[in-house]
Amino acid sequence: MNRVGMKATDFIYTLASGKKAKLSDIRSPYTIMLFFSPDCQTCNRTKQEMEASLLLKELIANKQVAVLTVYPEEDMDLWYTYQKGMPSSWINAYDKEQTLTLKTLYDLSALPSFYLLDKDKKVLLKDVMWEDVLYYLENTPSM
């Protein structure tokens, strides 16, 4: 399931506006996918570390990286409240149909969970921490 070197499973996510989109719709050399829960302390710490990263801000501004955050759980009130504090330069979404969980499309046994994808949505890193993603981005010559 979504192993390193394989193409990531496409799925539909929903934005706060109600608009639906697919992972495959994201056009970017790299996509950081973060599965998280607002009531997870590690998730919140990770979000703060990402927000503080000057490299990430620069890569997003230069359209080298897209960040997709996905809330895979069911408490929509919690998500709607939390997502208002998410960076507007990130794609902040939830799994309205609960497809990720019901069909076990991604390993979400622990949150936060990161996947780093290339432009073709091939998995470069799977189920790693933010530090691993940052290290990869810092050490990729084409960045």
Would you name each region that the model predicts?
Residues 1-24, 136-139:
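N-terminal "domain-start" segment that seeds a small globular fold
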Residues 5, 26-27, 60-62, 84-86, ...:
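A structural signal for short secondary-structure junctions
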Residues 8-9, 30-31, 111-112:
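Short loop/turn microsegments at loop-to-beta-strand junctions
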Residues 12-13, 35, 116:
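Hydrophobic beta-strand positions
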Residues 21-50, 66-68:
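Short active-site neighborhood of thiol/selenol oxidoreductases, capturing the structured segment around
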Residues 44-84, 98-104:
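Structural microenvironment flanking redox-active thiols in thiol-disulfide oxidoreductases
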Residues 80-115, 119:
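Short, internal strand/loop/helix patches
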Residues 118-143:
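Thiol-/selenol-based redox modules, centered on thioredoxin-like
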